[in-house]
């Protein structure tokens, strides 16, 4: 598993190439479709990358009054996010994090929390901490929207997943530190209500998309 410094170094170098991760598009579109963004007032994205998703949401899906806060460990990604959301700069805040899953936000300050292809990069402890932090930051009834690499459900996707896992075992750097995981065990049914969960296969790569509503404060 890559440590925070290794993750930062990799994604600082990876930069704009992040937007060429073709297998992510179908999962992200599904996440948008089930995210209820038409009523969003404050969106937080952990692992904002180049800001491509943010720019799409701000241009097409959220109200003109919606505020967006994006965080990323990579300085390169933060600079790209600022550039790609320049048109909406009055409503956008981009924060470079130190890699900690602790969030610099007040309790109950957002109604949408997004983490796409991030939890599959984190340790189990950091992933659970991020889930707890998302719960703290979200308003009651707010939605957490997640997407990650996951386990295959068809012969082809199982083969791709097996190859990916093999490369990760050989050297996590080869696959950017990401490996297939399952999101469901991270979602505590005592404080979250899962409203959508689906495995989406694109070009043989399996992704899990999950949307859950905060049910308790």
Model-inferred region functions:
Residues 44-101:
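Class I SAM-dependent methyltransferase SAM/SAH-binding core
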Residues 1-38, 52, 56:
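Conserved class I S-adenosyl-L-methionine
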